[in-house]
Amino acid sequence: MFLNHRTPVLPTPEQALRGRPVPEFTVPSRHTVLGNPLVGPYPDGLEVADFALGCFWGAERKFWQTEGVWTTLVGYQGGYTENPSYEEACSGLTGHTEAVRVVFDPAVVSYEELLKLFWESHNPTQGFRQGNDVGTQYRSAIYTHSPAQAAAADASRAAYQKVLTASGHQEITTEILPAEGRPFWPAEAYHQQYLDKNPGGYCGIGGTGVSCPIGVAPADGR
């Protein structure tokens, strides 16, 4: 989680690290804040959303503090390397970005409300960086789990682009792609709920200050 002065470039599938057929570490069984399992299968009626908005430590906290979120876990997504490690993701040779899987109850919090939180919690115009964190692993992304999620994500991007442009910001660089074919690989145990275990730890994400005109803003302090 530091400034890297090299120009980031996504690897091709041929250039990417091969990875391994099984993970080298075990994911904790329960969320340290919410108390629910990190890994599915999840209870009926819950939905899954995947977001990438910079350093996943601070990003995960944004979502677990949201009412209606049942569990969260951080991992690597959008690239080519199977079962990557954190060091491999940071090398820029996996193609993955740091992502947060959000399992939520749509009867309590809508996907559109999560999209609003996503857009307002980072600067989606920065390409392969987020603040001082530079690298392909910090790129902004939404990986959708249904046609309805894809339509909502696309509509929210268009709506947010209008207000960003009016405020003098650049074009959104967020990639919106289906989660199918882009597996979510859970990160190491020490990354899970990192800012709960380390309350004074690093949090490099920050928004543009521009409100996204969809959903309902979370309560103060979230």
UniProtKB/Swiss-Prot annotation:
One GO BP on record is: protein modification process
Q: Name one GO molecular function term.
A: L-methionine-(S)-S-oxide reductase activity
InterPro entries tied to this protein: Met_Sox_Rdtase_MsrA_dom, Met_Sox_Rdtase_MsrA_sf, MsrA_MetSO_reductase
Q: Which residues form a coiled coil?
A: none
Answer whether the UniProt record assigns the keyword Oxidoreductase to this protein. yes
Keyword Cell membrane assigned: no
User: Which keywords accompany this UniProt record?
Assistant: Oxidoreductase
- What is catalyzed by this enzyme? L-methionyl-[protein] + [thioredoxin]-disulfide + H2O = L-methionyl-(S)-S-oxide-[protein] + [thioredoxin]-dithiol; [thioredoxin]-disulfide + L-methionine + H2O = L-methionine (S)-S-oxide + [thioredoxin]-dithiol
Write the Enzyme Commission number(s) for this entry: 1.8.4.11
- A Pfam family (short name) is PMSR
Q: Which GO terms describe its cellular component?
A: cytoplasm
The residues responsible for catalysis, as annotated, are 55
Tell me its family. Answer: Belongs to the MsrA Met sulfoxide reductase family.
Function of the protein: Has an important function as a repair enzyme for proteins that have been inactivated by oxidation. Catalyzes the reversible oxidation-reduction of methionine sulfoxide in proteins to methionine.
Q: What is this protein called?
A: Peptide methionine sulfoxide reductase MsrA
| Phylogenetic classification of the source organism | Bacteria, Bacillati, Actinomycetota, Actinomycetes, Kitasatosporales
Gene of this entry: msrA
